[in-house]
């Protein structure tokens, strides 16, 4: 192909692209945008409470050193006509007030007939709030995200549905309900978590935690004590001192257990403990079609009781087994290095497996 032909083809391609882009722009309906902003400030003391209830947008909080809560709400509507966009703006009602010791920001939507163009109307309602870091908060957000600062020093109650929570640490108690979103928070002192259908839940260090986790995957770094009910979701804890759990239809992995672990039900699940420290007190697991895998330092002194193992597998390997016995063909007992300290109690309910191996 000579240079003249190549140039002609390039010009032809450019013409086609111009025609196509023009056709698209002619076919696209113009979009009208309407905006509204509401702002209000309130003097507060540290015994006051901030309460919000928003939807179809985000709630973003920042901290400052003033004894004041400043709330700014941005509403934006997009529609095929200016009248439709304005009608959408008019549908939104924002109530900002202080009553007693509670500063509140509440979103409500008036009922409105949109005709046949409902699918072409879009709007967002975003809260931007500045407040003292030690103020207590009660936040509710649907169809949007909650964004909090790095350090939150007031008691916190948070509900987020169909959106994400992004936050730093909580030095006071945290009560969280999260559904159909992701959760990313840093360290907590005391937390109660109600989680459902969350894609990923990430928590830093936790001193004490109660968690009801369903259809969600949760990752925790270091945890002092946890009370956990986990169903249809995987859980990973890097380090745990003490735990009380129910694990169903899940995969659970704990990097290390320092003190004790009690699992009232390990059902159709696998629990793996990568390191049970040498001075552990006890591990109690009641399994139903479950698998327990534990690694313990080879020089640790402890006992193992694996009971109701009729159709189950058991493996104890790599240790100095100083004594072992079997009762009724289904109950098996081991003493490791004299069996002087901790104890592993496993009820296999006939169909569950246990594997205990030595860490060199």
Language model features: what each stretch is:
Residues 1-360:
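Intrinsically disordered, low-complexity terminal regions
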């Amino acid at each position: 192909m000579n240079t003249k032909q190549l140039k002609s083809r390039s010009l032809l391609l450019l013409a086609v692209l111009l025609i196509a882009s023009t056709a698209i722009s002619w076919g696209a309906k113009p979009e009208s945008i309407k905006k509204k902003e509401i702002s209000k400030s309130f003097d507060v003391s540290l015994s006051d409470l901030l309460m919000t209830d928003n939807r179809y947008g985000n709630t973003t909080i920042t901290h400052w050193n003033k004894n004041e809560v400043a709330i700014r709400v941005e509403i934006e509507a997009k529609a095929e006509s200016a009248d439709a966009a304005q009608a959408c703006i008019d549908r939104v009602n924002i109530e900002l007030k202080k009553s007693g010791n509670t500063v509140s920001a509440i979103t409500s939507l008036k009922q409105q007939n949109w005709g046949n163009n409902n699918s072409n109307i879009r709007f967002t309602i975003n809260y931007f709030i500045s407040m003292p870091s030690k103020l207590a908060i009660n936040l509710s957000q649907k169809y949007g995200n909650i964004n909090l600062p790095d350090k939150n020093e007031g008691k916190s109650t948070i509900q987020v549905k169909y959106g994400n929570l992004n936050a730093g640490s909580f030095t006071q108690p945290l009560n969280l309900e999260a559904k159909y979103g992701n959760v990313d928070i840093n360290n907590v002192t005391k937390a109660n978590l109600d989680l459902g259908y969350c894609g990923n839940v990430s928590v830093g260090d936790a001193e004490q935690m109660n968690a009801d986790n369903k259809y969600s995957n949760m990752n925790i770094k270091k945890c002092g004590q946890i009370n956990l009910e986990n169903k249809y979701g995987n859980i990973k804890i890097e380090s745990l001192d003490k735990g009380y759990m129910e694990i169903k239809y899940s995969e659970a992995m704990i990097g290390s257990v320092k003190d004790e672990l009690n699992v009232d039900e390990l059902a159709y699940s696998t629990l793996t403990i990568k390191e049970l420290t040498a001075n552990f007190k006890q591990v109690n697991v009641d399994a139903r079609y479950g698998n327990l895998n534990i690694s313990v330092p080879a020089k640790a002194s402890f006992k193992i009781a694996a009971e109701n193992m009729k159709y189950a597998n058991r493996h104890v390997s790599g240790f100095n087994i100083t004594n072992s016995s079997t009762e009724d063909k289904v109950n098996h007992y081991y003493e490791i290095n004299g069996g002087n300290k901790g104890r592993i109690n496993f009820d296999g309910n006939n169909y569950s497996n246990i594997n205990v191996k030595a860490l060199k």
